[in-house]
């Protein structure tokens, strides 16, 4: 499967999982609990890990560090943009009062719902970069000489 298909498939899957999780905690009346956002990170981390692993499994020895790293970032970007678009609709049209409650807790009285969308975008992109770098440490092909071969 080509990388552009992978990042779209996994990015949209991550976004769907984030949206489903948000709607579930919304139905349960727990969407005001900010600590439940931690699971968002777990969902994104799993998706980025899975897409990089899939690419490495496909390419085997031809797998390159930069292509895996970039794939993780693109996957996270697709997930972020999709989720932020959903949240924009939710905050502006479905439950504007939720945005007001979040603003009081997070940003004080600065800005409107747009600041929340900016925060979500920055969080999503930055966590995608950090997670991609982290997972590539596991998946990168080592070019180091092993101790066994160094003494031969």
Residue map of PLM features:
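Membrane-helix interface/capping segments
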Residues: 52-68, 92
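Hydrophobic alpha-helical membrane-insertion segments
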Residues: 72-89
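Membrane-helix interface motif
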Residues: 89-99
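Short, membrane-exposed interhelical loops at transmembrane-helix boundaries
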Residues: 97-115
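Hydrophobic alpha-helical transmembrane segments
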Residues: 111-133
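Cytoplasmic juxtamembrane regions at transmembrane-helix boundaries
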Residues: 138-152
